[in-house]
Amino acid sequence: MGGQKEMADSVKTKLTGKLKAKKVTAPQAKAFSVHLLTASGSFLAFLSVVAASDGRYTAMWWWLGLALFVDGIDGPIARKLEVKYVLPNWSGELLDSIIDYVTYVLIPAFALYQSGFMGTNLSFISGAIIVVSSAIYYADTGMKTKENFFKGFPVVWNMVVFTLFIVRPGEWVAFGTVVASAILSFLPINFLHPVRVVRLRPLNLTIFLLWCAFGVIALYYMLDAPLWVRIGISVTGLYIYFIGAIMQLFPSLGREAALAKARKLVEKQQKSGEAP
């Protein structure tokens, strides 16, 4: 009996020790909450699929817009909380890529096919081009440049298809846009990241926010937007589409302002370090 009791106590001690060792810390809980925020994009994607299946495209784009907002804020929060180092066994990058493929690629391709505004055949072919080319693009580990530009069209099909839904160009113009963008995914041409690219950041971010504003107005009109909205979203969209290549051709464009800002930041950090 004594031996059994000692064995039971030993097992209990080991289990208690393991449970104590696995105690969740406050930083870990905060870090995991960021992963939950990122994962919420999958539910938003589900809601957008349901809406698209019912032909409620305005609702679908609202859900995808909310998913885009979540995708825009989870990264900065994750870096601030150092999630990658606090929870090294959980890959925020992989989770983000999975949800991005669904919200940026798969659902817009489905909506393009489901709506049929390019005609049945062209819509089907366009959807196939989008999902296959994007899957290959996501496998590229060198999709970012040193300046945080995307190398090649960054498969932001949610923005492209959304613009097509609002502007409603001819079916062959829309099809040509899809084909050209898919080809550009694999060419060494820079595309803008409106937040992470330092050069011309104030201007680029302003144009991006204007594009978002025109998009919200278009959704208010249930995608049947007036001409000024269609012109606005087209002009801002074309700027976002081409400015990366223009800045690649003219590498000095906006560089002085970016360097001056970097110098001020370094000086501020140095002064902060010298403070008692």
UniProtKB/Swiss-Prot annotation:
Record organism: Brucella melitensis biotype 1 (strain ATCC 23456 / CCUG 17765 / NCTC 10094 / 16M)
Main location: membrane
Reactions catalysed according to its record: a CDP-1,2-diacyl-sn-glycerol + choline = a 1,2-diacyl-sn-glycero-3-phosphocholine + CMP + H(+)
Periplasmic-side positions: 52-57, 113-115, 168-171, 224-230
Gene designation per UniProt: pcs
Cofactor: Mn(2+)
Superkingdom per UniProt: Bacteria
Protein name as annotated: Phosphatidylcholine synthase
Listed GO MF terms: phosphatidylcholine synthase activity
Cytoplasmic side: 1-30, 79-91, 137-146, 193-202, 252-276
InterPro entries, per database record: CDP-OH_P_trans, CDP-OH_PTrfase_TM_dom, PcS
EC main group: transferase
